[in-house]
């Protein structure tokens, strides 16, 4: 079973914990600004990072992601496809939840980085 916990870094204690069902495993935790994002069973869930409570409904339904990154209000979902052929990176605008682009990339794309 998966779990998301919030730890008070000053006291090193868990001050909030959310348990998931035995077969649920949240992945790809991202924080941007005051928002916390994670992927679970084809959905992207969003909550407030400061007073976080696990949301009950996905903000966005997406295909399988091998990984995802949130950068400047965009979700970059790495789709490894069949893990033997080239994959894609899907770019979503989080203000509209619209798919903006699908980029063809190499085999098993794993991350997207911002180079400033």
Model-predicted regions and their roles:
Residues 1-36:
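Acidic, serine/threonine- and glycine-rich low-complexity intrinsically disordered segments
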Residues 4-7, 45-50, 89-92:
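Hydrophobic/aromatic beta-strand positions that recur at structurally equivalent sites within the blades
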Residues 22-33, 62-72, 105-116:
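Repeated scaffold domains used in trafficking and secretory/extracellular systems
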Residues 29-52:
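C-terminal structural cap/anchor segments
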Residues 88-90, 95-116:
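Blade-level signature of beta-propeller repeat domains, shared across WD40, Kelch, NHL, RCC1
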């Amino acid at each position: 079973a998966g779990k998301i916990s919030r730890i008070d870094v000053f006291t090193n204690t868990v001050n909030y914990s959310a348990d998931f069902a035995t077969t649920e495993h949240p992945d790809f935790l991202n924080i941007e600004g005051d928002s916390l994002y994670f992927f679970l069973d084809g959905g992207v869930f969003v909550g407030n990072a400061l007073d976080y409570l696990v949301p009950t409904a996905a903000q966005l339904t997406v295909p399988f992601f091998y990984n995802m990154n949130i950068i400047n209000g965009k979700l970059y979902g790495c789709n490894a496809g069949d893990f033997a052929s080239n994959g894609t990176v899907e770019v979503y605008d989080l203000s509209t939840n619209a798919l903006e682009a699908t980029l063809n990339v190499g085999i098993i794309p794993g991350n997207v980085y911002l180079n400033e």
